[in-house]
């Protein structure tokens, strides 16, 4: 697809978004900023003959690697049926998650073929750049990487996965993706300018260049602005409500909860730049998502092996473990857990509470009215970490949820208001 046509289509999408968010100033401002960037791009692609004549022949249509990556991130031309891009499952307008909830209740993502579904919930791409490369520490704890099982070392390797996954973007091989890239004259020129004239001489080299560009875009501040109420609180720009403050104290307390055992990276609870994950892998006993198994056409007895599906791991002791996700934007990026089994954030907190309270009410899933369900993999559950906190009463559960909502980026705060309005109705 020519770059000017792609920009036109992208521009149409943004105008539609601005209409949708007319009542949400933060999101409308976000869409407006994107509109101006695309308008600039459109002007570049419709420059006069005299302007083109005075430009250097090798001038890149993209100002830098991140700009190229942004174009690639939104390009549906890189999928088999030209219907799916990175942004389809990681939409920047909804917290870089998949906003499509009409299939499998949003637990799994629909592929480019319009029928295939994955087995895991698409994680948010926000703040993903801070995950270290996958490795196993000397103490045997697996850490980092991308995807739920850490199988990609970094963002670039992660970006190379979905285009070739038959149930995602569905392209047969790297060469087919590169051929799609070469349909766009701006890509041809831009890749040469940013990666060298011989970048197109080898399909693997060109494909690798594509993944590096997408990673460069994902490393930008748009994915990790650190401007939530919590961040503003640390800078003295926001005063927490009593409930939010109680939740903050509980979250960082090693006496009353176990939250920060896995969801804290920094050594101080007041350190800026906290990602709210230590990137370790654990099995927390998540039950099977029986309700969605029919949607993915798999037996309800199907077991996801988690970390054991990572080619770098062959020890059964890692079976059923998943990377601890960031809690940044957690309130607006449900459903939750690797299989999307819980729809509501409060349910997640109550699920953790079941390990420290044997009261009947805490052994029941409020979304189903039934017991929580057997864990998908029982033998590797991190009981030591899960059982080290106190039981939470209703007030403390509400407080922790209130605090978690303060981790929402400023641009997504209107989504919280929409959630509240939807629950009220």
Model-derived segments and spans:
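Noncatalytic linker/hinge segments flanking ATPase motor cores
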Residues: 166-171, 301-305, 366-373
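Conserved nucleotide-diphosphate donor binding/catalytic pocket of glycan-assembly enzymes
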Residues: 155-172
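Short glycine/threonine-rich turn/loop motifs
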Residues: 29-158, 225-364, 415-425
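Post-cleavage N-terminal segment of exported redox proteins
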Residues: 2-70, 166, 172-245, 249, ...
């Amino acid at each position: 697809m020519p770059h000017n046509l792609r920009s036109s289509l992208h521009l149409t999408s943004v105008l539609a978004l601005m209409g949708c968010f007319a009542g949400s100033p933060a999101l409308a401002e976000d869409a407006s900023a994107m509109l101006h960037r695309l308008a600039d791009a459109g002007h570049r692609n419709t420059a006069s003959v005299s302007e083109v004549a005075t430009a250097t022949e090798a001038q890149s249509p993209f100002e830098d690697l991140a700009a190229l990556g942004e174009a690639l991130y939104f390009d549906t031309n890189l999928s088999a049926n030209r219907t799916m891009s990175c942004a389809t499952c990681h939409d920047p307008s909804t917290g870089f998650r998949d906003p499509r909830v009409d299939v499998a209740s949003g637990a799994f993502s629909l592929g480019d073929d319009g029928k295939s579904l994955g087995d895991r919930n698409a994680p948010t791409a926000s703040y993903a750049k801070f995950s270290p490369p996958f490795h196993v520490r000397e103490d045997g704890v697996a850490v980092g990487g991308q995807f739920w099982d850490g199988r990609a070392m970094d963002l670039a390797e992660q970006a190379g996965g979905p285009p070739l996954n038959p149930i995602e973007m569905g392209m047969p091989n790297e060469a087919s993706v590169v051929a799609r890239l070469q349909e766009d004259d701006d890509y041809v020129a831009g890749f040469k300018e940013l990666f060298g004239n011989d970048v197109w001489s080898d399909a693997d080299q060109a494909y690798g260049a594509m993944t590096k560009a997408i990673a460069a875009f994902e490393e930008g501040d748009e994915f990790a602005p650190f401007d939530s109420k919590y961040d503003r609180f640390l800078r003295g720009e926001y005063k927490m409500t009593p409930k939010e403050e109680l939740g903050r104290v509980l979250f960082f307390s090693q006496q009353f909860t176990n939250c920060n055992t896995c969801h804290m990276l920094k050594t101080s609870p007041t350190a800026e730049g906290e990602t709210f994950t230590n990137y370790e892998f654990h099995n927390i006993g998540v039950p099977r998502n029986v309700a969605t198994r029919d949607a993915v056409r798999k037996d309800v007895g199907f077991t996801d092996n988690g970390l054991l599906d990572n080619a770098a791991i062959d020890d059964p002791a890692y079976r059923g473990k998943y990377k601890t996700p960031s809690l940044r934007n957690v309130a607006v990026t449900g459903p939750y857990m690797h299989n999307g089994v819980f729809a509501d954030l409060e349910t997640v907190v109550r699920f953790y509470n079941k390990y420290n309270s044997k009261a009947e009410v805490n052994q029941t899933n409020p979304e189903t009215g039934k017991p929580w369900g057997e864990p998908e993999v029982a033998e590797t559950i991190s009981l030591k970490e899960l059982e080290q906190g106190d039981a939470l009463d209703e007030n403390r559960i509400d407080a922790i949820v209130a605090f978690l909502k303060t981790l929402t980026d400023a641009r997504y705060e209107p989504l919280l208001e929409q959630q509240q309005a939807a629950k009220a109705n």
